[in-house]
C-alpha cells in the first residue's frame, strides 16, 4: 500500500533513498529530503506491507499533465518481488489524469517494467 511520507518516517525514507546511486552522499541525501518536505510540487510516498515500510517513490509534479518519477527504491531484501512495479501502478491511481514520466535516474527501471504508459 502506498502512503504519503510523514516526518516520523524520515530515517526510514533516508535509508531507502540512500540505495539510489545519486543519493549516497549524506549532504545530498539531506538536501533531497528537505526538498520533499518543503516543496509543494514534490511528493514522497512509502510502500507499506503489513507494518513494514519497504519501498519509496518520489515524484515532481511538473504541470497539470505530467508527474516525473525522481526516485524509486526498494529494500534489497524485498527486491525482485514486483514491489517497484506495484508502487508505480499505485502512483498511477493517485495521479490518474497525469502521464508518469521517468527522469534520468529512474528511466532504466521504468522502461524495463514498461509501466508508465499503462502497458502491463
Curated annotation (Swiss-Prot):
Enzyme Commission number(s): 2.3.1.-
Keywords: Acyltransferase, Transferase
Domain of life: Bacteria
Class of enzymatic activity (EC top level): transferase
One Gene Ontology term of the molecular function aspect: acyltransferase activity, transferring groups other than amino-acyl groups
All residue ranges annotated as the N-acetyltransferase domain in the record: 3-120
Protein name: Uncharacterized N-acetyltransferase in lysA 3'region
Higher taxonomy: Bacteria, Bacillati, Bacillota, Bacilli, Bacillales
